[in-house]
Amino acid sequence: MFGAEIILTPGGEGSNGAVKRAEALAKEHPEWCFMHQYQNDANPMAHYNTTGPEIWRDVPEITHFVAGLGTSGTLMGVGRYLREQNAAVKLIAVEPPLGERVEGLRNLDEGYIPPIFGNWDGAKLLDRKRVVRPRESIEMTRRLVQECGIFAGISSGASLAGAIKVASEIEEGTIVFIVCDGGWKYLSTGAYTDDLDAAEAAAEKIIYF
């Protein structure tokens, strides 16, 4: 549409391969602009300046904040803001098990740690991580549609699953989780229509990272 050249990278490398290729191109062509959402400080700052204050304004009684671990921008930006308002707020990251795939999320033990996570002292900021499997993510994605009328994506279902796990572990509290993507991106995956076994198998074949 805009005359841009599309540069493909090996599918087996997932988005990590695309990021590495983009980094190499940025070095080769310093006059080009590489936004780099995994490293660009504007990512967490957007959440520090907007999402965090909105949550605090609407839910000042928040005790736990749950979000998926992708670029880590949401967790770092919102998390830092909430901690500055109330140091007792617990910050929980949601990630898939090592070797399993949930779209939009990553397990830090798989070798790629987003620069934002390191630059914003993510290891110190987070209280804990909750592991959510692909099947749980799809189940919760369907619940969001069927029970709440929210057409969200699979990583949003994972965040809901993580929030429910947190809720099962505490006696009382106020948990906020982030619906971070839209369902329109997953219409071809069968996540909303296939039986769960088929939907899970399809999700496992898609390489995101």
Spans of features found by a protein language model:
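Gly/Ser-rich phosphate-binding catalytic loop and adjacent alpha/beta segment
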Residues: 1-26
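Active-site/ligand-binding loops adjacent to catalytic centers
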Residues: 3, 19, 31, 83-154, ...
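Active-site/ligand-binding-proximal alpha/beta "capping" segment
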Residues: 29-69, 78-81, 123, 135-150
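Glycine-rich beta-alpha junction loops
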Residues: 39-42, 70-73, 95-100, 109, ...
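Short, well-ordered alpha-helices that flank and scaffold nucleotide-derived cofactor binding pockets
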Residues: 57, 80, 84, 164-168
